[in-house]
C-alpha cells in the first residue's frame, strides 16, 4: 500500500546506481593453435572475457562458441572441497573438467609430482597453505592435456623456482597444437608466449594485431 511505502521510505533510502558493462560489443575469433596475449589495465574487462569463455559467467547477450577441452588457470583453488584430501580433490576437479576416473588415475602421479605435494597429498586441503592449494590447482590444469589453455597471471604461483617450473611447463604444452589465451601486464611474458596481441579498454577491444604491434600500441596509449 502507499502508506506502507511511505513508512518504509522513512527508514530506507533508494540509492541510485549505474549499470557498468564489463564487456561490450565484442567480436573475436581465435583459431586453433593460436597464442593470444590480452593486454589492458585493471577493469578493462580481460578477466570477465576469459570467465565467459570458460563458462564461469555468462554474457547478457550474444553467443560464445568453444570447440575443445578448456583448462583455465584463473582461480586456481576454485572447485576444491576443503574437507577432501589433495588426492580426492584431484579426482573432483578432474571430473569437473570432464575427465573420467580412469583418465584421472593415469594423470594422478604426474599431477602430484609436479605440485611437489607427495608428503601431503592424503591430508585435507583445509590444512594446506594458499601456496600449496595454488600449486595443486595449477598442476591439475596443466597436466590434463588441454586443447585450450587460458591463463590469467597464474604464473606467479609459489617461489621463484616453482614459477620457472610453471613457465617451462606452459611452454612445453604449447609445443602441441593447443590454443592459448594469456592475460598479463608484462610485455616480456606476452612476447615469450604469444604471437598475437589484443588490447582492451572499458570492456572493448581497441587493438588486435601481432604481439609486437600490440605491445607498442599498449605502451604508447597507456
Specify the residue positions occupied by each region the protein language model found:
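The feature captures the beta-strand-to-loop junction immediately N-terminal to the Walker
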Residues: 39-41
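Conserved ABC ATPase "signature" C-loop
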Residues: 202-203, 218
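H-loop/switch region of ABC-family ATPase nucleotide-binding domains
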Residues: 184-185
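Pre-NBD coupling/linker segments of ABC/ABC-like ATPases
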Residues: 1-22, 212-221
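A short, surface-exposed alpha-helical micro-motif characterized by mixed small hydrophobic
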Residues: 190-192
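Conserved ABC ATPase "signature" region
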Residues: 5-10, 91, 103-120
Amino acid at each position: 500500500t502507499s502508506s506502507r511505502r511511505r513508512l518504509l521510505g522513512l527508514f530506507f533510502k533508494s540509492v541510485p546506481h549505474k549499470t557498468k558493462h564489463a564487456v561490450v560489443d565484442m567480436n573475436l575469433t581465435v583459431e586453433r593453435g593460436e597464442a593470444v596475449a590480452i593486454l589492458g589495465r585493471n577493469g578493462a574487462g580481460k578477466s570477465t572475457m576469459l570467465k565467459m569463455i570458460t563458462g564461469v559467467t555468462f554474457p547478457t547477450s550474444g553467443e560464445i562458441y568453444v570447440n575443445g577441452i578448456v583448462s583455465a588457470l584463473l582461480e586456481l583453488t576454485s572447485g576444491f572441497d576443503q574437507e577432501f584430501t589433495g588426492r580426492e580433490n584431484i579426482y573432483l576437479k578432474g571430473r569437473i573438467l570432464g575427465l573420467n576416473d580412469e583418465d584421472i588415475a593415469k594423470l594422478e602421479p604426474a599431477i602430484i609430482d609436479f605440485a611437489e605435494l607427495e608428503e601431503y597429498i592424503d591430508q585435507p586441503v583445509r590444512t594446506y597453505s594458499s601456496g600449496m592449494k595454488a600449486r595443486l590447482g595449477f598442476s591439475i590444469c596443466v597436466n590434463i592435456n588441454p586443447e585450450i589453455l587460458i591463463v590469467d597471471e597464474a604464473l606467479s604461483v609459489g617461489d621463484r623456482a616453482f614459477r620457472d617450473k610453471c613457465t617451462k611447463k606452459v611452454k612445453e604444452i604449447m609445443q602441441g597444437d593447443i590454443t592459448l589465451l594469456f592475460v598479463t601486464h608484462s610485455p616480456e611474458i606476452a612476447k615469450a608466449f604469444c604471437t598475437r596481441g589484443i588490447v582492451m579498454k572499458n570492456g572493448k577491444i581497441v587493438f588486435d594485431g601481432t604481439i609486437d604491434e600490440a605491445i607498442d600500441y599498449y605502451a604508447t596509449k597507456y
